């Protein structure tokens, strides 16, 4: 979606907030929810985000094992989230809310090279340079139980 279409959504009263973010090392979408006006005013420069998203686990416990990029010694510096407008889309289950995936940059204008989106993009480029077209699919695994959360917990199931 281009910025004029986003402005149109705002003008029509169909967009109040935008969820901006990027996947962390576990693939969890991390970011923030901003007012649509703030999104428009700031999307070109990007949005500050703490680099701790590369320094914690899926439960948000800060890792202390000598991480080079994100750590206490560096003070968990800010990185910049720059929205990829090609990923901008309304969130169907939330009224007047859209989402936009961001690419991550350092404050010095360099790619955050450990960002999963950057790593994937680099691998796609390398594969294409070798004459391959990468393809991927998701496999969802789930189980059905004749139980509920309480009965499962009582039986000490996972």
Model features per residue range: what roles?
Residues 1-158:
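ATP/Mg2+-dependent ligation/transfer catalytic cores
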């Amino acid at each position: 979606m281009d910025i004029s279409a986003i402005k149109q959504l705002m003008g029509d009263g169909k967009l109040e907030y935008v969820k901006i973010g990027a996947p962390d090392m576990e693939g969890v979408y991390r970011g923030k929810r901003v007012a649509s006006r703030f999104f428009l005013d700031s999307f070109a420069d990007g949005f500050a985000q703490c680099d701790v998203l590369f320094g914690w686990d899926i439960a948000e416990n800060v890792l202390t094992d000598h991480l080079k990029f994100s750590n206490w010694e560096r003070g968990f510096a800010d990185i910049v989230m720059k929205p990829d407008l090609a990923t901008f889309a309304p969130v169907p289950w939330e009224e007047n809310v859209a989402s936009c995936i961001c690419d991550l940059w350092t404050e010095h204008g360099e790619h955050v090279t450990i960002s999963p989106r950057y790593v994937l993009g680099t691998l796609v480029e390398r594969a294409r340079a070798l004459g391959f077209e990468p393809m991927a699919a998701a496999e969802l695994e789930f189980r059905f139980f004749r139980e509920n959360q309480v009965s499962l917990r009582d039986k000490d199931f996972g």
